[in-house]
Amino acid sequence: MKVRAVVLERIGEISLRDIEVPGTLEPSDNEVRIAVKTVGVCGSDVHYYKHGRIGDFIVKEPMILGHEAAGVVTAVGAHVADLKIGDRVCMEPGVPDFASRQTLEGHYNLDPSVRFWATPPIHGCLTPEVVHPAALTYKLPDNVSFAEGAMVEPLAIGVYAAFKGAIRPGDVAVVAGAGTIGMMVAFAALASGCAKVILSDVAKAKLDLVADHPGVVTVDLNREKLADVVAALTAGHGADLFFEASGSPHAFDDMMDVVGRGGRVVLVGMPQDRVPLDVVALEVKEISVIGIFRYANVWERTLALLGSGKIDVKPLISASYPFDQSVAAFERAAQQNSSDVKIQITF
């Protein structure tokens, strides 16, 4: 079938056109059809646009972009009981093999055969309608807009990172990187019980967006040394947690100086190349290192946090473009303006 979509043709070229895709818009027994209303432009979309690959995921043929989405249910399969036509929803973009070992053990994000929107060779959701498993489609709280619903996907990464970090009430956390994911991690850490989150970056404009947020201390790495700020704020003990959300190899330079004894490091960002790690310091200080990949089993909790008002993502939405201006939206996102956090596309 042919659909109208935002298509990555090749490195540096995006178009809005009709494209032939497999499948049908008629949902099977356990699926729903959704009219897409809002889609966020993710850093991974931009990376594919600029570089054509992320690690082993290589764009070899035209691919529809987009995986952060919210919309309205327009049809339901015969066995779907929890959703109905007209429901406002957001969609978890990774569809695992529901019978795989990883899925059955509760780690469906690690299923090697997961089909994740806009990850080659799987098409994304920047198209007017999609069909998706009902089990991975979630109702939006009444007070959560489509724009906020399209932010659930990146926020879920933050919530999952906070969960894996085993936050204790009163913890002090460092978050390296004030991009979309870093800010989501910071908000989730505070909502999970951290007394203070120290957010560092080289982009002052991004730090300024959250400088007045209760519990957040910002560190401009162009002007201050992170280790000095952490030492001053923790009486020299160091941070309980360090969330690496920048993907920058420089974040590892003084990581072990920043984390306190018995602390935890949660790796969220993905460096392009291998990075050195001070293993001796890690052992002497008994620092635990935890890696995370996307998320699992946190979408309902993420929506509950949004609906409760404990986390407000609206200030992070920098601009919205109509679907027919999608190419312009990607061109802006690719510029990586220091004051932009999230660009969205609306239908």
Regions found by a protein language model. Name each.
Residues 74, 197-198, 266, 290:
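Conserved beta-strand positions in the Rossmann-like core of class I SAM-dependent methyltransferases
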Residues 95-176:
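NAD(P)H dinucleotide-binding glycine-rich loop of Rossmann-like/cofactor-binding domains
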